[in-house]
Curated annotation (Swiss-Prot):
Substrate binds at R106, D143. Pfam families: Hexapep_2 (PF14602), THDPS_N_2 (PF14805). The keyword Acyltransferase applies. Gene3D superfamilies: Hexapeptide repeat proteins, Tetrahydrodipicolinate-N-succinyltransferase, N-terminal domain. This is 2,3,4,5-tetrahydropyridine-2,6-dicarboxylate N-succinyltransferase. Homotrimer. It comes from Rickettsia akari (strain Hartford). It comes from the Bacteria.
Amino acid sequence: MSSLIKEIEEAWQIKGQLLQDSSKLIMLKKTLNDVIASLNQGAIRVCEKKENSWEVNEWVKKAILLYFITTESQLYNNNYNSWYDKVAPKFSVDTDENIFKEAAIRKVPGAVVRTGTYIAKNVVIMPSFINIGAYIDEGTMIDTWATIGSCAQIGKHCHISGGTGIGGVLEPLQAKPVIIEDNCFIGARSEIAEGVIVEEGAVISMGVFIGSSTKIIYRDTGEIIYGRIPAYSVVVPGVLPAKEAGKPGLYCAVIIKQVDKTTRSKVSINDLLR
């Protein structure tokens, strides 16, 4: 792995000159294809949890960006659509049926998954878009018209509801993508962006918009936090009243309750939100 990282880092330093050196370009393309294949298999990932902290593997981001620089667009076709892109689809009309059967993946018409994306076992992909570098763990549902941004990390047994936007990020290199940990529910038409971390077991109601500067308020105490939804929190949209009379209030996300793991597993999402 160290030699692979070294090669990517060296190529990154001369990225503006790569297209002018055909011999280096040929060697680099093979390396980049290996990185994309490893992303597809989940052998490497853009961001991973180490000792309770999420860390970005910047070299993987660099490899993806180099892949864009060194790859020419081409025409792709399937049975009902065609498109012109630098990134191939993860699944094509030639994909062996056994790949889906062995992994128990269900992918319906209209679902777009770019290569360089990891899709684990028992994932259901409705008509949606999943970008390069994303990681979708076991048993998760990506519902209709959801968008999973580049490098976004989605945990096990999550439900990403219809029309939801999960932000991704390739640049700046050190920035974290959005991270949705295990057993989370993200309500329909919500948007989680700008590197926000939704910790394990959290429930986000329909229509909640959270970015890095969004005020996240504990309803009981009034405490305000940013960029993180604590584990097993239940969150709804709200408005923070203006301090001055007659001034408009500002949007916020409100933590209305926190439950333990046992309660979360036994109580329905609808009951939690009520």
